[in-house]
């Protein structure tokens, strides 16, 4: 087959990535005054449990694939190419033209709506109304209400306040800190915008308080993917736990130590989007936070990189690497998720996993979605090229065995995570009538009948109606059931153990002197991730991470490892910003791969 490296000129350069525009007071415009119902709510434990449950709504909004034209932040981060009528915000982000007039307000509204609701709960808690339920409530649901349950409620409230505030800080920098106040329609509101440092400290303090109450109430650990419903009174799967609070704290402090904000900026005299100076101690603070998580986990074995189990029932399933299964629902073996967003698997739910499959699965494999015409989110060549060879060396490295001579050969012997993340020409996907078959994305001389390994290009090939525009389809998170009428439940994983190891690797590496060898600790964390990814061990179990690698090269390796391991998980956009590498990796058009069959 003849190859052609194609350019997609309509994906505009993203080197101008900026913070979201300034704020509004929409969150204060409350149409209903709920104060009249407080006495009834806080005398009934079932209603209070419902209040706490409600705090979890929209926890995954910034991660959602429904955001910005069905591609979320993956589009401006150059991970996916979007197609649809709702691309304006994604284009503003990609072009660096976000301003007060065109900025989206979901981060602002979601944060302050939840913050206000949590403050109402906290105020009632602090006034003793929640504790009074212990002796007066005749409607205790499920099991007996205890002091530990009430403290569990409070721990969750602290965690979710930190969660929404941390997301807000990523978008805006310093924010107005309303703390525990609850404003009404008649209140005069004059809360100044706090500095970046003050905002980070407040979020970190919320994490510390969350850990205190969650540990104290017996919820230091909660498996992330066992029970999609969860329960305030019973099982706590899918809810906040102490370890999730530690993980969130580590993430917040990683961002706070990064070059975007850990620096002196002449354009930020009020320190709204930076600290105003560089301090290496911020890297140490972030390292200490993530190390606390790792040490606690090492002592208790709560979390691990999902080792995975091969499913050899079909050729397609046996072809998938372990990495693919880290994102599928597995109530027994998946100990990797730390915090998840649980979505319905009902067919009519527009935010569910079925809709996710409809947006990203190839036409030949989505018969039940044939009339939706929603296909979008096509991986870019830039993302595909980031995946190294199976020996761990980059495809442009002289030590690798990368070939660019045939449409299928260029994907052979690559990092196994590639085929778990992206479907390319020659990739296995399950197919209705044949159980499994190769997927074809080529153009040119089409095979229309016969061998199913060759005929899918009629529907899936580049330039076909409603088909890929880059030559690739997304595979990560997608249930590959060949269009069968099944709706398998899958969580959206918001934090997982691999991210913890990547934070530890990055912070440890930044603590050594410039020009020095990368610390052994950083190398070991990356090797752990690559071992699970089924990268070849190579000489002395190095997994492509050599002993003599310097700090600066290790930094680039970690950046690429995050790009690969965390693809489509709402990290790349923020990573590119915090590392200040947008000019290097995002400027210029995106690319795809055109394969012509002759």
Predicted regions and their residues:
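Bacterial N-terminal signal peptides that target proteins for export
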Residues: 2-10
């Amino acid at each position: 087959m003849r190859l052609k490296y194609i350019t997609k000129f309509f994906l505009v350069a993203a080197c101008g990535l900026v913070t979201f525009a300034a704020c509004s007071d929409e969150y204060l415009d409350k149409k209903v005054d709920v104060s009249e119902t407080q006495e009834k709510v806080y005398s009934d434990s079932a209603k209070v449990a419902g209040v706490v449950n409600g705090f979890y709504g929209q926890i995954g909004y910034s991660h959602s694939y429904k955001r910005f034209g069905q591609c979320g932040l993956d589009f401006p981060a150059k991970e996916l190419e979007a197609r649809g009528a709702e691309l304006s915000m994604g284009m503003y982000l990609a072009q660096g033209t976000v301003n007060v007039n065109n900025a989206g307000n979901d981060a602002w509204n979601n944060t302050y709506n939840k913050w206000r609701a949590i403050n109402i709960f906290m105020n009632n808690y602090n006034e003793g109304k929640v504790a009074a339920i212990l002796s007066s409530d005749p409607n205790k649901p499920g099991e007996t209400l205890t002091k530990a349950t009430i403290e569990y409620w409070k721990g969750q409230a602290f965690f979710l306040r930190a969660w929404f505030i941390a997301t807000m800080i990523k978008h805006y920098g310093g924010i107005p800190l309303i703390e525990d106040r609850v404003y009404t329609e008649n209140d005069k509101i004059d809360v100044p915008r706090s500095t970046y440092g003050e905002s980070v400290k407040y979020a970190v303090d919320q994490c510390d308080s969350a850990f205190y109450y969650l540990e104290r109430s017996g919820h230091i650990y909660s498996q992330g993917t066992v029970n999609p419903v969860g329960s305030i009174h019973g099982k706590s799967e899918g809810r906040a736990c102490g370890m999730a609070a530690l993980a969130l704290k580590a993430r917040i402090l990683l961002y706070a130590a990064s070059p975007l904000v850990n620096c002196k900026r002449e354009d930020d005299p009020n320190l709204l989007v930076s600290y105003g100076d560089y301090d290496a101690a911020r890297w140490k603070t972030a390292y200490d936070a993530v190390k606390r998580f790792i040490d606690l986990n090492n002592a208790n074995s709560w979390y691990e990189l999902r080792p995975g189990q091969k499913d050899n029932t079909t050729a397609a399933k046996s072809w998938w690497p372990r990495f693919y299964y880290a994102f599928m629902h597995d109530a027994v073996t998946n100990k990797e998720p730390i915090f998840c967003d649980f979505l319905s698997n009902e067919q009519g739910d527009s935010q569910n996993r079925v809709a996710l499959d409809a947006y990203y699965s190839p036409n030949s494999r989505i018969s039940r979605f044939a009339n939706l015409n929603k296909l979008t989110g096509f991986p870019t060549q830039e993302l595909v090229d980031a995946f190294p060879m199976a020996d761990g060396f980059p495809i442009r490295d002289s030590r690798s065995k990368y070939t660019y001579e045939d449409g299928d050969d260029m994907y052979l012997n690559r990092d196994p995570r590639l085929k778990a993340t992206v479907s390319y020409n020659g990739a296995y996907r399950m197919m209705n009538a044949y159980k499994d078959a190769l997927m074809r994305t080529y153009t040119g001389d089409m095979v229309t009948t016969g061998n199913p390994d060759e005929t899918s290009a009629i529907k899936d090939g580049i330039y076909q109606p409603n088909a890929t525009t880059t030559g690739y389809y997304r595979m990560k998170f997608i249930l590959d059931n060949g269009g069968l009428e099944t709706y398998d439940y899958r969580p959206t994983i918001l934090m997982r153990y691999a991210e913890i190891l990547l934070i530890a690797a990055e912070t440890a590496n930044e603590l050594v002197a410039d020009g020095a060898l990368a610390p052994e600790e950083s190398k070991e964390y990356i090797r752990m991730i690559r071992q699970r990814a089924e990268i070849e061990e190579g000489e002395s179990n190095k997994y492509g991470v050599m002993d003599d690698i310097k700090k600066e090269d290790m930094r680039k390796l970690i950046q690429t490892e995050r790009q690969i391991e965390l693809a489509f998980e709402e990290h790349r956009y923020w990573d590119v910003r915090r590392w200040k590498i947008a000019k290097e990796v995002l400027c210029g058009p995106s690319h795809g791969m055109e394969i012509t069959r002759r």
